[in-house]
């Protein structure tokens, strides 16, 4: 997504772009844009306490996070311990909770936090729980985040609050990627009910100045909620719920629609 967003931001000709993710999760695109100086700063928001704790730990306790990645055992006993920390959702220790999020994201099947461990509890599968836990690579990613931390803001607000807060800012490019309609309860700790999707659409439809993109799984409900805005299919090469190719729905603000068509 980062390359696609870079092209759009270039077409929009925004001065000192501010990239905002109200439902951040991994926020990989935002970090890539920041590292390449495509955007001046980024705001990462997620109401999920584990996601918030990860980004807080990664930006404010980078060295400690890197040390944990270097030292942590890769075993089923440790996986169980980290799962219990994650389930506790105790934000009084953002380092512990944030690291548990990171550990499970790297050791669970397809990175799904509530999913099972890669290779199964018996570790009898083709791939084991260490398959996606390359210590050197992960330490490098954390180091990059730490080096950019003075240009990263982290918050744990309701996503609609963030959309409303930045909706009148013409320098903002907002990537709104809320919980899915169909598989939301399987993929997110804070999944959405129908009314939540409706409330978000009401908020997005009131945005006046910010440039924005919304992405969802294909859903008649979402198509109807955003029927006054440009919509198209977006093909992704990987999706957490189904490795391989996946098609999502992309919805865009008027200015972004023009940029997509340019």
Language-model-detected regions and their locations in the chain:
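Conserved S-adenosyl-L-methionine
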Residues: 4-5, 15-77
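A residue-level signal for conserved active-site and pocket-lining positions in enzyme catalytic cores
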Residues: 25, 55, 102, 212, ...
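Short, solvent-exposed loop/turn segments at secondary-structure junctions
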Residues: 26-29, 48-50, 107-110, 159-162, ...
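Long, positively charged, glycine-interspersed low-complexity recognition regions
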Residues: 193-262
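SAM-dependent nucleic-acid methyltransferase catalytic core
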Residues: 1-10, 14, 58-175, 179-185, ...
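A short helix-to-beta-strand connector/capping loop
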Residues: 38-40, 147-152, 227
């Amino acid at each position: 997504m980062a390359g696609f967003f870079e092209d759009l931001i270039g077409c929009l000709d925004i001065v000192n772009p501010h990239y905002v993710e109200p439902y951040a999760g991994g926020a990989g695109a935002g970090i890539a844009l920041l590292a390449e100086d495509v955007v001046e700063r980024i705001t990462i928001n997620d109401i999920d306490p584990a996601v918030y704790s990860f980004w807080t730990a990664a930006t404010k306790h980078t060295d400690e996070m890197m040390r944990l990645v270097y030292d942590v055992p890769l075993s089923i006993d440790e996986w169980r311990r980290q799962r219990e920390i994650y389930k506790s959702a105790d934000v009084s220790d953002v380092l512990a909770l944030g690291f548990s999020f990171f550990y499970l994201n790297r050791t669970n099947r397809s990175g799904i936090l509530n999913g099972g461990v890669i290779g199964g509890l018996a570790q009898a599968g083709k791939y084991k729980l260490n398959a996606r836990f390359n210590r050197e690579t992960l330490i490098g990613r954390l180091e990059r985040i730490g080096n950019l931390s003075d240009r990263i803001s982290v918050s744990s607000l309701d996503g609609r609050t963030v959309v409303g807060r930045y909706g009148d800012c013409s320098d903002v490019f907002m990537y709104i990627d809320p919980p899915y309609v169909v598989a939301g309860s399987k993929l997110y700790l804070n999944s959405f009910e129908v009314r939540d999707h409706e409330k978000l659409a009401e908020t997005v439809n009131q945005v006046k100045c910010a440039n924005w993109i919304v992405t969802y799984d294909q859903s008649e409900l979402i198509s109807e909620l955003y029927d006054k805005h440009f919509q198209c299919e977006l093909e992704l090469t990987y999706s957490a719920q189904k490795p391989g190719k996946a098609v999502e729905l992309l919805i865009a603000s008027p200015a972004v629609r023009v940029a997509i068509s340019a």
